[in-house]
Amino acid sequence: MIPSDLRTDWTVEEARAIHALPFPDLMHRAQTLHRAHFDPTAIETASLLSIKTGGCPEDCGYCAQSAHHDTGVKATKLMATEEVLAAARRAKAAGAQRFCMGAAWRSPKDRDMDRLCDMVQGVAELGLETCMTLGMLSPGQVARLRAAGLDFYNHNIDTSPAYYARIASTRTMEDRLETVEQVRRGGIKVCCGGILGMGEAEEDRIALLVTLATLPAHPDSVPVNLWTEIEGVPVQGRARAVDPFALVRIVALARILMPASVLRLSAGRTEMSDELQALCFLAGANSIFVGDQLLTTGNPAAWKDRDLLTRLGLHVAPARARPLVAAN
């Protein structure tokens, strides 16, 4: 049975009205829904590894890994499976429950699929949830990754449909949404969110969330990224810092529109004060990345995260049960 508060027919007008509520009312509504679906004191933890860095043919205007931009990021080849598994072991020892593997591609080559599937199987055998972000996938690639045991696939839509053309030209919003739907239909849980602070308007942030909340099914995980300064990318010239309360309002709106989705504070936490992160947790954020590095940006030190959670009386959530998937 689908809970009555899970809707996929939200309108921008409804979302705009909720977003404009007085701050105490907005926070109360978000926290009430959060408590209905989650332990409000539990925070999920994930670790992220770039398994193939740089040289991406896409021209995403925010990305340091695009071959179109002079950012100083050196292109690397796909990592060896054992290197990835060694990193996964370190992540588990550091407290991560989920291990995310990202490759800077438009889409993976079929010749790489055996190694990618080996990585998924190896990470799963360590007892970690598995996640990958590899760009666009064919139906056959989705099926292979699912058979290997992939739990989650990340494919962000980045921004609103109206603002998307300002961000990238080598792939469309429709391309991204098609990939997300293909992953969902293939039986892999969807991780899909966006980036705030790339020069977009408040209306774009609201429309981004409405786009996610009106998918056939809400994403299992919704990463909320804050733009982090990167020299050499087009977005740098028009990026604008996000007001702290504006960020909290967006997190609260995401919780209200998608009450059962995990909301992950992702890139940009190094720019957030402890107080701002606490407000985001109160608004419904319930996941973070652990480890001092994301794909190409920094992340708070492990001791800082442990200290913050302790001071707030929060704890790391137990890993969710992973369904068994037969391998080929």
Swiss-Prot record:
Recorded hits in InterPro entries, A to Z, give:
Aldolase_TIM, BATS_dom, Biotin_synth/BioAB, Biotin_synthase, Elp3/MiaA/NifB-like_rSAM, rSAM
Looking at the record, the residues that make up the Radical SAM core domain are 41-260
So what does this thing catalyse? (4R,5S)-dethiobiotin + (sulfur carrier)-SH + 2 reduced [2Fe-2S]-[ferredoxin] + 2 S-adenosyl-L-methionine = (sulfur carrier)-H + biotin + 2 5'-deoxyadenosine + 2 L-methionine + 2 oxidized [2Fe-2S]-[ferredoxin]
EC number of the protein: 2.8.1.6
HAMAP family found in the cross-reference section: BioB
**Organism phylogeny:** Bacteria, Pseudomonadati, Pseudomonadota, Alphaproteobacteria, Rhodobacterales
- Membrane-spanning residues where? none
- Give an example GO molecular function: iron ion binding
Q: What is this protein called?
A: Biotin synthase
Q: Can you quote the record's cofactor note?
A: Binds 1 [4Fe-4S] cluster. The cluster is coordinated with 3 cysteines and an exchangeable S-adenosyl-L-methionine.
Q: Where does [4Fe-4S] cluster bind?
A: 56, 60, 63
| Family indicated by similarity | Belongs to the radical SAM superfamily. Biotin synthase family.
**Can you name the source organism?**
Cereibacter sphaeroides (strain KD131 / KCTC 12085) (Rhodobacter sphaeroides)
Per UniProt, where does [2Fe-2S] cluster bind? 100, 131, 191, 264
The biological processes this protein is annotated with in GO are: biotin biosynthetic process
Q: What does this protein do?
A: Catalyzes the conversion of dethiobiotin (DTB) to biotin by the insertion of a sulfur atom into dethiobiotin via a radical-based mechanism.
Q: Which Pfam families match?
A: BATS, Radical_SAM
